[in-house]
Amino acid sequence: MLMGEYQHNIDAKGRLIVPSKFREELGEKFVVTRGMDGCLFGYPLNEWSQLEAKLQEMPLAKKDARTFVRFFYSAATECEIDKQGRINIPANLRTHASLEKGCVVIGVSNRIEIWSDERWHAFSDEAEENFDELAETMIDFGF
């Protein structure tokens, strides 16, 4: 299971250190794509395969489904962890997530998320302010 929050920097070449606690579960290669809320999602290959199977079941006749699948897949890239524990994040994904220097890498169960410092702290601050109300809504999901 992927969990935790780690601060790292992205270098001028777009390389980011993958937290050592995540490397074994992610494997030598994993898929990074656009995420929601202005971050990037990173999936181990086995999780990506399961997600692909679900996406292939989306109804092609529905415009929203086509749009989502196109947008999600078009940015997906397989990243390989180098000997220094880094991945190279393509420019289009760095732009999507506003990654410039400081980054936060978090584990979210079966995936990682890569955030710019600024976006993560804004998101985190808002979530913390509303945590009690948010927790209350989890009842609707059977939590």
UniProtKB/Swiss-Prot annotation:
<keyword id="KW-0238">DNA-binding</keyword>
<dbReference type="InterPro" id="IPR035644">
    <property type="entry name" value="MraZ_C"/>
</dbReference>
<protein>
    <recommendedName>
        <fullName>Transcriptional regulator MraZ</fullName>
    </recommendedName>
</protein>
<dbReference type="InterPro" id="IPR007159">
    <property type="entry name" value="SpoVT-AbrB_dom"/>
</dbReference>
<comment type="subunit">
    <text>Forms oligomers.</text>
</comment>
<dbReference type="InterPro" id="IPR038619">
    <property type="entry name" value="MraZ_sf"/>
</dbReference>
<keyword id="KW-0805">Transcription regulation</keyword>
<dbReference type="InterPro" id="IPR020603">
    <property type="entry name" value="MraZ_dom"/>
</dbReference>
<dbReference type="GO" id="GO:2000143">
    <property type="term" value="P:negative regulation of DNA-templated transcription initiation"/>
</dbReference>
<dbReference type="InterPro" id="IPR035642">
    <property type="entry name" value="MraZ_N"/>
</dbReference>
<keyword id="KW-0963">Cytoplasm</keyword>
<keyword id="KW-0804">Transcription</keyword>
<dbReference type="InterPro" id="IPR003444">
    <property type="entry name" value="MraZ"/>
</dbReference>
<comment type="similarity">
    <text>Belongs to the MraZ family.</text>
</comment>
<dbReference type="InterPro" id="IPR037914">
    <property type="entry name" value="SpoVT-AbrB_sf"/>
</dbReference>
<dbReference type="Pfam" id="PF02381">
    <property type="entry name" value="MraZ"/>
</dbReference>
<dbReference type="GO" id="GO:0000976">
    <property type="term" value="F:transcription cis-regulatory region binding"/>
</dbReference>
<dbReference type="GO" id="GO:0003700">
    <property type="term" value="F:DNA-binding transcription factor activity"/>
</dbReference>
<dbReference type="GO" id="GO:0005737">
    <property type="term" value="C:cytoplasm"/>
</dbReference>
<dbReference type="GO" id="GO:0009295">
    <property type="term" value="C:nucleoid"/>
</dbReference>
<feature type="domain" description="SpoVT-AbrB 1">
    <location>
        <begin position="5"/>
        <end position="47"/>
    </location>
</feature>
<feature type="domain" description="SpoVT-AbrB 2">
    <location>
        <begin position="76"/>
        <end position="119"/>
    </location>
</feature>
<keyword id="KW-0677">Repeat</keyword>
